[in-house]
């Protein structure tokens, strides 16, 4: 494990990435051959082995998921669709500034007279005018590498920083998983001031979720339901007139003391306020994990510490763009 698929525009540096993975991490390269099979599908090669179709390639990779492979150029929509379902696959989009790519393109003797306009037309056709358009690949990619230098060592340093073999890039940790759920819950928020989401967990099982907004039956905050949030009042001010329930309150109310039980963990994409922290301690939450700081963090930390509740900030994996 894993299989890395490389995609990206012409002359972006995919060959250099293959060289890095082969040299530094012992990957086996898989290349697309220029000819097609009788069904019009691409043919692939790894070492001396020729794989005559997408199905052959998938059948070859699946039982070898413990081995390391890099596919240089994903050109088949069917191949990409099949690989994206596999837990051992990582799609990496390699990009570079267009003038850098143009100058690389012209280094091929037979293409030295290509104009920039001609190169842009070739690039646009590949990016926008096919079922396998590059723009779609960019949207689906797990990682984006900007190869903005002609010095190979600079690209290799970026690849090392990207840590392609990090298991969290293939299957998220519990912290990443539940924080993503909290962020998803936040998208349901109707609060005009900020979106906040929360997930309550025990034994790695979700007990309840919550997001902030006006209570059941009331007009949504983003439809004028809370005058305070629809005004220009500052953060942390006039909270006594706010009609919105906080995400943590919603999750705790949904769960109740009996369902919370012992050793529950509360994940919230924003550090709980002091008022929510009081309720968190009362329900016996063991740990609070948050992502973004809030202006009451020190007060929250003091209260939770006094109550024996662990407070921890979640630091997500390194950015997906390098």
Curated annotation (Swiss-Prot):
Keyword hit for Ribosomal protein: no
Biological process, per Gene Ontology: cytidine deamination; dTMP biosynthetic process; dUMP biosynthetic process
Location relative to the cell: Cytoplasm; Nucleus
Keyword Nucleus: yes
Domain CMP/dCMP-type deaminase: 173-311
InterPro entries: APOBEC/CMP_deaminase_Zn-bd, CMP_dCMP_dom, Cytidine_deaminase-like, dCMP_deaminase-rel, Deoxycytidylate_deaminase_dom, P-loop_NTPase
EC number, as in UniProt: 3.5.4.12
Key words, A-Z: Cytoplasm, Hydrolase, Metal-binding, Nucleotide biosynthesis, Nucleus, Zinc
Active site: 248
Molecular function per GO: dCMP deaminase activity; zinc ion binding
GO cellular component, one term: nucleus
Known function: Supplies the nucleotide substrate for thymidylate synthetase.
Family to which the UniProt record says this protein belongs: Belongs to the cytidine and deoxycytidylate deaminase family.
Protein name: Deoxycytidylate deaminase
């Amino acid at each position: 494990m894993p299989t890395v698929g490389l995609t990206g525009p012409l002359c972006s540096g995919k060959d250099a990435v293959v060289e890095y993975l082969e040299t530094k991490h012992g990957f086996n390269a898989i290349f697309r051959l220029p000819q097609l099979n009788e069904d019009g599908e691409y043919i692939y090669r790894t070492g001396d082995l020729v794989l005559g179709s997408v199905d052959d390639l998938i059948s070859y990779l699946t039982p070898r998921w413990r081995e390391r492979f890099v596919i240089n150029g994903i050109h088949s929509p069917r191949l990409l669709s099949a690989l994206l379902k596999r837990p051992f696959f990582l799609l990496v989009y390699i990009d570079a500034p267009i003038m850098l790519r143009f100058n690389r393109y012209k280094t091929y003797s037979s293409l030295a007279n290509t104009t920039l306009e001609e190169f842009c037309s070739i690039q646009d056709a590949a990016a926008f005018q096919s079922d396998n358009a590059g723009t779609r690949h960019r949207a689906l990619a797990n990682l984006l590498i900007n190869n903005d230098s002609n010095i190979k060592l600079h690209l290799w340093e970026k690849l090392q920083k990207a840590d392609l073999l990090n298991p969290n890039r293939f299957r998220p940790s519990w912290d990443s998983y539940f924080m993503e759920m909290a962020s998803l819950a936040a998208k349901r928020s109707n609060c005009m001031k900020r979106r906040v989401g929360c997930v309550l967990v025990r034994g790695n099982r979700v007990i309840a979720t919550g997001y902030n907004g006006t209570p059941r039956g009331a007009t949504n905050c983003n439809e004028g339901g809370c005058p305070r949030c629809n005004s220009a009042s500052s953060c942390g001010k006039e909270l006594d007139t706010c009609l919105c329930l906080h995400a943590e309150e919603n999750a705790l109310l949904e769960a109740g003391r009996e369902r919370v039980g012992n050793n529950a963990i509360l994940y919230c994409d924003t550090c709980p306020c002091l008022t929510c922290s009081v309720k968190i301690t009362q329900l016996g939450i063991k740990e609070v994990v948050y992502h973004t700081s809030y202006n009451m963090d020190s007060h929250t930390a003091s209260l939770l510490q006094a109550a024996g509740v662990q407070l921890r900030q979640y630091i997500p994996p390194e950015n997906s763009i390098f």
